[in-house]
């Protein structure tokens, strides 16, 4: 009888724990969803509150920067290195290595013959 009671108690605690974890996950999901909606609301409010003259000034600055070859824009561009590309050349090196193994199965094994004269 006591064994049956302890099994019921364990089942009760497991169920309570599972319901608690699921509840916490649901609360977390709702909080994250509300935070995203609040961020969108702030962005829309900021865009609405910005004066039309401010928008024109920003547009003018963007146009001036592109016409005058703004150095900050040029400096922020990613530099691409010149020369061989090691990422794409790795397959070429691998195929050369396999080809060398096919032609000479023991490329690193050197046979040394010693001339021993007595």
Curated annotation (Swiss-Prot):
Glycans are attached at residues 51, 84. The modification Hydroxyproline is found at residues 81, 84. GO terms for biological process: cell-cell signaling involved in cell fate commitment; maintenance of root meristem identity; phloem development; regulation of cell differentiation. Residues 1-29 form the signal peptide. Keywords: Developmental protein, Differentiation, Glycoprotein, Hydroxylation, Secreted, Signal. InterPro entries: CLE25/26. The keyword Calcium does not apply. GO terms for cellular component: apoplast. GO terms for molecular function: receptor serine/threonine kinase binding. Belongs to the CLV3/ESR signal peptide family. This is CLAVATA3/ESR (CLE)-related protein 26. It comes from Arabidopsis thaliana (Mouse-ear cress). The gene is CLE26.
